[in-house]
UniProtKB/Swiss-Prot annotation:
Subcellular location: Cytoplasm
Organism: Pseudomonas savastanoi pv. phaseolicola (strain 1448A / Race 6) (Pseudomonas syringae pv. phaseolicola (strain 1448A / Race 6))
Xref: InterPro entries: Integrase-like_N (IPR017856), TACO1_YebC-like_2nd/3rd_dom (IPR048300), TACO1_YebC_N (IPR049083), Transcrip_reg_TACO1-like (IPR002876), Transcrip_reg_TACO1-like_dom3 (IPR026564), YebC-like (IPR029072)
UniProt key word Secreted: no
Single biological process term from Gene Ontology: regulation of DNA-templated transcription
A Pfam cross-reference name: Transcrip_reg
Protein name per the record: Probable transcriptional regulatory protein PSPPH_3775
One function term, GO molecular function aspect: DNA binding
Family the entry assigns: Belongs to the TACO1 family.
Cysteine disulfide partners in this protein: none
Length: 248
């Protein structure tokens, strides 16, 4: 129930880059649009839209921008049809990588993703080539200082899969994909305010990287995340803390 989240350092690095590059707004506008298109414009009956709404507000997106994105999704305004596509491949050192995209032009997106893999010494694979190495899970994060014992008890009562206490004191609650929203709502009702909540692809095995390979893998991940159509990039890379410190 306690331990170090192996992929937290990569995630935190990515979040800093997202904020720095201003890409986070584009990401959540697309998510709002697709969520509204698939499940309707009422966040009360559309859990995916509610989650996207919370994320957008947390990123300080204006209500007007949010409303326009939702309206575009439910068809109240014209807009290009956006679809969700996934890509799989291997990076340097045999690291498994999954890429989630939202695009209005699948040919453009496929070419851009393939170019990134090729340029950085990786290979874009076929559907299923690395997906079996990942599980789709819910991850609900809480900042350091939360009552650990009470949170663990509430999480177990809500049928969470696991609770992990990280080295910095923050806590991650993991759920099944299907149980994510129920657990999130139960913890919220119990008075626990999450710092983040999302559906993620967690690797079932990890590839521990040395400095040279880590630099190459992170270059590929950065290049993929820089692509306009990319929403999320997941890998099974495990970068030791001392290596991450050298990377800066």
């Amino acid at each position: 129930m306690a331990g170090h989240s192996k992929w937290a350092n990569i995630k935190h690095r990515k979040e800093r880059q997202d904020a720095k590059k201003g890409k986070i707004f584009t990401k959540w506008i697309r998510e709002l649009t697709v969520a509204a298109r698939q499940g309707g414009g009422d966040p009360g009956s559309n859990p995916r839209l509610r989650l996207a709404l919370d994320k957008a507000l947390g990123a300080n997106m204006t209500r007007d921008t949010i409303d326009r994105a939702v309206a575009r999704g439910v068809g109240a305004s014209d807009g290009d049809d956006v679809e969700e596509l996934g890509y799989e491949g291997y990076g340097p050192g045999g690291v498994a990588i999954m890429v989630e995209t939202m695009t209005d032009n699948r040919n453009r997106t496929a070419a851009a993703v393939r170019h990134a893999f090729t340029k950085c010494g990786g290979n874009l694979g076929t559907d299923g080539s690395v997906a079996y190495l990942f599980d789709r899970k819910g991850q609900i994060s809480f900042a350091a200082g939360v009552d650990e014992d009470a949170l663990i008890e509430a999480a177990m009562e809500a049928d969470a899969d696991d609770v992990v206490t990280n080295d910095d004191g923050s806590i991650d609650v993991f759920t099944s994909f299907s149980g994510f929203y129920a657990v999130r709502n139960a913890l919220e009702a119990a008075g626990f305010k999450a710092s983040d909540a999302e559906i993620v692809m967690l690797p079932t095995t990890s590839a521990v990287l040395d400095l040279e390979t880590a630099e190459k893998v992170l270059k590929l991940i950065d290049m993929l995340e820089d692509l306009d159509d990319v929403q999320n990039v997941y890998s099974n890379a495990e970068i030791p803390d001392d290596v991450m410190e050298q990377l800066g």
